[in-house]
Regions:
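Phosphate/NTP-binding elements of NTP-utilizing enzymes
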Residues: 1-132
Length: 132
């Protein structure tokens, strides 16, 4: 007979496996974001592809989708280090600001995942640390 703790761990492992295979569902359920069908496909492909390139015109939400993927990846795969490379520092910081201003207010679960004592976003140093 399994203990309650062992049953909880087994259930958590099942949900983690499900959400790792369906990252778009994790974004909707955990971050409380309503994704369009093409965003679901892009998130899924980001997760399963070793190399992913998304070329799109202005206003299609590339930064927003990148922010969603970074957050989902950091939560579902503990101890993941994510580096955002861009042409300028401001463009990279833009992704972190999207996390802070667009994603966190809609998801108390995401807010609880972030270690605010070690996180900072300013002009010279920008980092968001997750508790896991």
């Amino acid at each position: 007979m399994k203990t309650r703790y062992e049953r909880i761990l087994a259930g958590a492992a099942l949900w983690a496996g499900f959400y790792r295979a369906n990252i778009h569902r994790f974004a909707e359920d955990y971050l409380h974001i309503e994704l369009k069908w093409f965003q679901k496909i892009l998130l899924f492909m980001m997760n399963v592809s070793r190399v992913f390139i998304y070329i799109a015109s202005r206003g299609q939400g590339k930064s927003f989708l990148s922010a969603i993927y970074c957050v989902c990846r950091a939560i579902l795969y503990p101890h993941t280090k994510i580096c955002i490379a861009s042409g300028t520092r401001g463009q990279a910081i833009n992704i972190l600001e999207k996390i802070q201003t667009d994603l966190i207010p809609n998801s108390p679960e995401l807010n609880a995942e972030i270690d605010w004592k070690q996180s900072k976003i300013n002009g010279t140093n920008a980092i968001i640390m997750f508790k896991n």
